[in-house]
């Protein structure tokens, strides 16, 4: 089978096509129908991935993940967009996406519900990842139960601490009744296979967290503008790479702000003073993705608003 390099992949536009239109699922033999669910200790397998895009090792786990993955925000977290969401998810899997990332807080559970309707029949095809935003043991265990129910699965491939921003949050997470105890218990019971942490505000806080605990993965903001302010590439990426963690990139376009196609709203409608600007960005989506993939990332999360 001919290997597809990153340049060819991006040039063919598969990155955009993977989440636009719906199609029927295929099993490993190319027949219409769902791929059977895997056992909790087995990696999922999408038969299309290896011919659709390059893959990378997901850190120390041994899983081969496609270089592009589907995120559970935008359309997927909006109530009333169930049909569109299911089409996006199914089409993404059909075209080789084998990693889906969501969170308990996305759309107050709507994202997990939308993904769960597809996972009911296609769980065996994708690495399924979600997050807890609670910093305590009890709160995180409650969220885990809710996530499993909404995602219609009995296990997660990855459970992550969501958007850790401040040192006091790190201290609470690692306290006697902190969320890290929930992550460890869930993994020891086989409900969760791997543990991760995420964030897109303060790289030095995340650096402290990954020095305290051997997480399997880290989801961080990585984009062409990152080096200019609170740089994840400069402050966090080297340590994550040194530890052999799976590195997942997000915020590739900084919510479109670095794209030349972005039209800034009037300044008085831009509520975040840190991001206020009268000018569009300077690069296109292909350049944004190419930059991200030049870094040592396992996969890059994309979302779609229809």
Task: Describe the residue ranges of each PLM region.
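N-terminal small/glycine-rich loop or linker at the start of catalytic domains
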Residues: 61-76, 160-163
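C-terminal segment of N-terminal export signals and the immediately downstream linker at the start
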Residues: 23-68
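Alpha-helix-loop-beta-strand connector modules within alpha/beta enzyme cores
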Residues: 116-129, 181-185
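N-terminal secretory signal peptides and thylakoid transit peptides that target proteins
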Residues: 1-17
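Conserved, mostly hydrophobic/aromatic
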Residues: 58, 70, 100, 115, ...
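Conserved beta-strand positions in the central sheet of alpha/beta enzyme cores
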Residues: 69, 99-101, 157-160, 196, ...
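Beta/alpha (TIM)-barrel catalytic core signal, keyed to glycine-rich beta->alpha loops juxtaposed to Asp/Glu
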Residues: 45, 164-306
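Distinct, well-ordered alpha-helical segments
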Residues: 111-120, 140-152, 170-177, 201-214
